Amino acid sequence: MAAGKFASYHRNVQMNHPLVSSMDLLGSKSALGERRSDAFKNVCIHGTLPRKKKERVPIRSSDMFCHMGTLPHTKSHRLPNPLMQDIKEDYPFQERRTGIFNMREHYLDPAMEYVKFSKDRYIMDGGTPDKLKKELEEELKLNSEDLRSHAWYHGRIPRQVSESLVKRDGDFLIRDSLSSPGNLVLTCQWKNLSQHFKINKVVIRLNEAYCRIQYQLEHESFDSIPALVRFYVGNRKAVSQQSGAIIFQPINRTVPLRCIEEKYGTSPVRRLELGIMEVKSEPTKRLSLNFGQGISQEQSLVRGNLLRNKEKSGSQPACLDNMREKRRPLKAHQSESYLPLGSRQPCLSQGMDMKTSPKPHVFRTGSEPTLSPTEIRRFNHEVHPVEALRGSDSQLCPRPPPKPTKAPSIKQSQSPLVWQSSEANYCEFHPTPPEDCAWSDSHSSHNSYIEDQRTDEIETLSFSNSELSFPALDDSISQCSATDFCGNVEDDEFIRPVYETVSSFCPNDFQSVLLTAENKPLETSLLRRAKELFTNNDPRTIAKHILRMDCKVARILDVTPEVERMMGVSSGLELIILPYGHQLRLDLMERHSTMAIGIAVDILGCTGNLEERVATLHKIIQLAVEVKTLGDYFAFSAIMKALDMPQITRLEQTWTMLRHQYTQTAITYEKQLKPFSKYLHEGEALDAQEDVTVPLVMPLVTLLERQSVLFEGMDFWENNDRGCEILFNHLQTARQVAHNATVYKKNAQRILEGFKPDELMSEIFKTEFQMRLLWGSKGALLKQSERYHKFGQILTALSRKLEPPS
């Protein structure tokens, strides 16, 4: 409008008053630009500064410099031309008056070459390249544990920008996550694809007053991000097993982090806007009519907050982020385009009549068409009625929701994405349930997205370690039964795992071929019969019998579907790391200690000549070799525990004769078995898990059941200089044990395939039989601590009887 009215004026004519408004400049099309487009093809719309050329050019018409506004100046400001709406004034009017105009009174020197000068670039660069270089060097000189000291850290850059930086396989950089503030993302290129890996933060609370943060991608954890990068780059290890991506070439930043933050925005609102952009678009720049404010004012606008809470005007809807309610943080999987603002509205069903909800006291201004009435909008009801929000054309954040499609074939019901917010999903649980514990009809709809989400939530309610709490939901659970709560689940009905409180070992109810109804501790006939069975079978057969019984006790093999439902998992190796696996952990400790005591009794019970005792020791060492070969580290640790008891190690005559008569066995024990046992108990056998059938779980079980009294020697990390490292290794082993439970089961099935166990041999390796043999029918019912203490005294007496102390 304005451009058409004054199209006949020469563009350098000065006026005393502005003739157009900022809205006219931004909203209307200039007729002058249409008519004289050919005349301005070579015109640069940026500000210019003179620079001396080597060669002189012939003087041309003053039209060549018409874009500079070189007519004699007056006291009034010049009129901004519509063609110059993207111009950012580099210098105030007075500076140009005293500077540029003094060179020539009426025209510029044609010997000068005018260089493009960008205002944005000037602000981003902070002045000169030398200044930027110095600032970057200062950042890189910081502590090596500081992320800013590493050039591969790029700060808050958008996802699309990071993908454009990594161009070859192995290229990588670290950036801040815009969708999940506070987290870091590893961006890399692998197999010609840009991949992003979120770096997880793990808070390790050592005690109530001290905790530390570790960073991990999959399994390995590190105290800092630089340590994580050094590990994956130095070892050329895949950052993800699924993708196989390997990083080795860092992409370094060339400017300070300050410039990156200024370019892509430092405020949370600006980061949100960058996060939801699918295609990069240059935002419309706002032309300021006040040229006298200069760079200082423009610079403060860039570095300051671009949002002004009041007196905004424009054609877009007002920003809702100025309301009092705090914005909720986004989850990593949620879309920023559908961020819920303000209070939640109850979910609507298809069967209900659409009722008009009371409108909030928020006034919408601008010419943007209103959204479809079928789309549910949530605003804050706590805003003051008198506070009207007015938009700004160029500086509103975040962007308004997308306009509804005009295609009649696409219905709103087919786009449930507006409800993918976690707050929207959980709004189903907040209304108070009726007395009959059934969900209200107004909160459910047939074949609805919300109902599917509610079903998914119900399936994951129990045994959740989340720190979030839903009071209304907790009240509902306490009032309703599990059957009513899961009434809508047809296929996979959730069954609450059973917290076992009774041991699976029942010595007095044990049906035995060798034992009578009541027996005394260490009956001679039973000891003799058990020793015959042990002597008449080869170590390989004995090892398979032990492996079979260990797999049954640990619930690796022969687990019925009923037991699986009771446990809530498919293997006992998973159950032992869960809170309600307390009883299984106690049973495993019982079997381990009972087996070790039984082996010690087998050696110390040889009250005859020395040769018999040495032969028994030789057979037990061979058995340790076999169970190690079969991968039964549980039994292996029990045997090694027995051989390492002080009552056994003090038998100097027995060990000396073993070295003479069975030299190879003694060497195997000293050079192979003992180092491997130490290796296992220090948690260093993480890589030796391929052929394992029953992993070593005793250190983990001991740690989780510290309140229980165990046989001495299991809490070895308490008096070790590397105690913390050993403890951490066992916690890492626990992860692998639970993760590889299926592998252990397959290994055990493969080894025991076609094996036909002997009934009597199987009986003597059952825990109930060993308890009755060692403590009798009455003593087996005593407390564990009391039984172990008394039997320790018995073993000491037997050892001193065989070889009296000197």
UniProtKB/Swiss-Prot annotation:
SMART domains: RasGEF (SM00147), SH2 (SM00252)
One family name in Pfam for this protein: RasGEF
Keyword Coiled coil among UniProt keywords: no
Organism field: Xenopus laevis (African clawed frog)
Recorded GO MF terms: guanyl-nucleotide exchange factor activity; phosphotyrosine residue binding
Keywords of this entry: Guanine-nucleotide releasing factor, SH2 domain
PANTHER family hit by this protein: BREAST CANCER ANTI-ESTROGEN RESISTANCE PROTEIN 3, BREAST CANCER ANTI-ESTROGEN RESISTANCE PROTEIN 3 HOMOLOG-LIKE PROTEIN
PROSITE patterns: RASGEF_CAT, SH2
Annotated ranges, domain Ras-GEF: 538-805
Protein name stated in the entry: Breast cancer anti-estrogen resistance protein 3 homolog
Listed CDD domains: SH2_BCAR3
Region (Disordered): 308-343, 390-412
A Gene Ontology BP annotation from the UniProt entry: epidermal growth factor receptor signaling pathway
Function: May act as an adapter protein.
SH2 domain segment(s): 152-251
